[in-house]
Design a protein with these regions (language model features):
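Short Pro-Cys-Gly-centered "Cys-loop" motif that presents a nucleophilic cysteine in a tight turn
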Residues: 1-58, 66-168
């Protein structure tokens, strides 16, 4: 039976989630995470996608994207296919790395967007990868530190997110 087509349009907001097959790790080391981030830094501008939030955990990752003229499916296909091939060669393994297709949830601008930015960026804290907000500020595999000006990330759109929270 064919899969349902994903709904996408220029300017659509997507909460994208990728998971390792059978709950396995998709990132075993910081080198793995760096390779993935390097791929994002190349593909985000190329596909004219905005990334407002992101978080890499051991066995899954979350992103908040606004599509440009290129569908999110193109970005995700290039990202996940390239990374899975690299990962499989690196660890001398075969087969699927990711559980099914990535999950993509269309989001409304208000009021869900602010909560989603919080949810995605607090994931490492909930997963106990960091213990405090100060540690989260310095956690390099999440967009939170970029928003807190503790690190930089050229492909993360911080100005838009700052605008969402400007009334606080």
């Amino acid at each position: 039976m064919p899969r349902k087509a994903r709904i996408d349009a220029p300017g659509a907001l997507h909460h994208v989630i990728i998971r390792g097959i059978e709950g396995r790790k998709i990132f075993r080391s910081d080198d793995d995470r760096m390779n993935f981030v390097d791929r994002l830094s190349e593909l985000i501008p190329k596909t004219k996608t905005d990334c407002f939030a992101w978080s890499l955990l051991d066995n899954h990752a979350h992103f908040l994207f606004r599509t440009g003229s290129v569908p999110v499916a193109v970005l995700m296909s290039r990202l996940l296919t390239g990374y899975a091939g690299w990962f499989n060669r690196r660890y001398r393994r075969h087969g699927q790395l990711f559980q099914n297709r990535y999950k993509s949830i269309l989001c409304q601008e208000d009021p869900y967007l602010k909560e989603l930015v919080r949810y995605i960026h607090l994931n490492p804290l909930r997963a106990r990868l960091v213990k405090t907000l100060e540690e989260l500020d310095a956690y390099p595999w999440c967009g939170h530190g970029v928003l807190m000006s503790e690190s930089t990330c050229a492909w993360q759109n911080v100005e838009y997110v700052y605008g969402l929270f400007s009334d606080y």
